[in-house]
Amino acid sequence: MKRSSVSSGGAGRLSMQELRSQDVNKQGLYTPQTKEKPTFGKLSINKPTSERKVSLFGKRTSGHGSRNSQLGIFSSSEKIKDPRPLNDKAFIQQCIRQLCEFLTENGYAHNVSMKSLQAPSVKDFLKIFTFLYGFLCPSYELPDTKFEEEVPRIFKDLGYPFALSKSSMYTVGAPHTWPHIVAALVWLIDCIKIHTAMKESSPLFDDGQPWGEETEDGIMHNKLFLDYTIKCYESFMSGADSFDEMNAELQSKLKDLFNVDAFKLESLEAKNRALNEQIARLEQEREKEPNRLESLRKLKASLQGDVQKYQAYMSNLESHSAILDQKLNGLNEEIARVELECETIKQENTRLQNIIDNQKYSVADIERINHERNELQQTINKLTKDLEAEQQKLWNEELKYARGKEAIETQLAEYHKLARKLKLIPKGAENSKGYDFEIKFNPEAGANCLVKYRAQVYVPLKELLNETEEEINKALNKKMGLEDTLEQLNAMITESKRSVRTLKEEVQKLDDLYQQKIKEAEEEDEKCASELESLEKHKHLLESTVNQGLSEAMNELDAVQREYQLVVQTTTEERRKVGNNLQRLLEMVATHVGSVEKHLEEQIAKVDREYEECMSEDLSENIKEIRDKYEKKATLIKSSEE
């Protein structure tokens, strides 16, 4: 049975106070982010973001005192950056859910819910903290005063790697404070779970048992190694920097434990040196050829392709071999039949030889028999040569048949590949239209398969080609018609642009005329002002010489004023006439622009019905903008005249 990796035995550590030193590559307990209820097991530990070495030493409660050696000491006041996503609302809600579940499951005396934990008060936080810390220190009671110093101090003593400020204790439920505090409470819950598991776990080692069983994380604990670690740590805390005695003692115990043979150590060392040399050689080869893995992968892919080709070739050879085996079986049967006939002939020869031996032949009979035997032997030799020639011819025909079959299969593979690309096969493909264009090669069918596939493939394929050519011709005709329509539209657009350009030139001329009239009116005003100024000077002159003809000067002044009023009235009348003329011109332009706009809208509607996608810009909108612009100018001119 596997034991938990957290032990409470002799080498286990019951205190939850912070260890003297922490692994620099670990930042502390990281709250699990899974949505399921967390169970006790291996806790996730993240690496710090800072690359510099940071001292995570807290208060040490060991009885050995402080360490005097300067080796291995890295101190820094740099704060560790919290890697947890405290700005993530989902993460904070998960932490709140874990806190609420833990409080509910462990008999928290007060009512608590997800809603109440969104922004708790300081009083509620202190109750929750006291309840949680009671699992680690049952006799603890939170003091009534200076809790803002007590709570951060307890977290620091427990080894919480991130600082909690005093000011955050006054604003626990604030949006900028609560995420840090609820993450610290979840960390405290993880510590409680570890502490509970350490209490409930059995001792790692029994008496007289130097080796422990394999734990859940696959680690095989060793009592000798743990004792050695304890002694080295105590010596290290006493100020020692070398541990040769402990190393020698451990080495002797390990030799006794494993019955180490000193003679075998030399062979193992030599083997180790050879392996190290081989590793160095392989490292050098890797440095010399960094892309060797890629080249090996390419070679592997090439070899796999060759293997596939050879497998296909072997399958062809097997099919050919099966055909040859069938023919060989036929030949063996023929040979057996011939051998049987030969045996029958031998028996007949034996019988005839016996008859010959038992009877008396003349010399002529013997010569005749020998002559017949020679003729039969020549016939046999000739037939044997003919048989060998026929067998060679049969072999050549079989080779020719195999090559032809391979060529046909290659052409069929290319045909099927092209048909799949054209979506003609399988039968339910997009362009098959219910026809089966797949050709299954069957050499045993003979010439009848050609007629079958001609009716199955050639005729439907010819129909598809004719339909495709008709669709292409229709598309070309449609394209030509659309191109003609596009040319007509372009001509109409050019004509409309020319009309708009003419209207713009007329409007520009009207603007120039208007500016000229305004300039003339301003010059007239300046002229009147200069005359008025001269009259004012003359008035002052008359006032200085009032004793020389006051009545005459007053009469002259009245005449000049009447003349001035007449000039002002004349100027006002001219301005009114110019404004009326300009307004009439603008109304004429607006009327003309409206008629052009209406005509263009009709043309655009007609064009949209014929070819909706050919319009790239809306000319009526530009004309509307020009019309609105000049209507605004006409309104401004009217208001300025009034």
From Swiss-Prot:
This is Kinetochore protein NDC80 homolog. Residues 251-618 are annotated as: Interaction with NEK2 and ZWINT. Residues 1-250 are annotated as: Nuclear localization. The keyword Cell cycle applies. It comes from Homo sapiens (Human). The modification N6-acetyllysine is found at residues 53, 59, 527. Residues 446-642 are annotated as: Interaction with the C-terminus of CDCA1 and the SPBC24-SPBC25 subcomplex. Residues 18-33, 63-74 have a biased composition (Polar residues). Changing residue 234 to K: Abrogates binding to RB1. One of its GO terms (molecular function) is identical protein binding. It is found in: Nucleus; Chromosome, Centromere, Kinetochore. It comes from the Eukaryota. Pfam families: DUF5595 (PF18077), Ndc80_HEC (PF03801), NDC80_loop (PF24487). Gene3D superfamilies: 6.10.250.1950, Ncd80 complex, Ncd80 subunit.
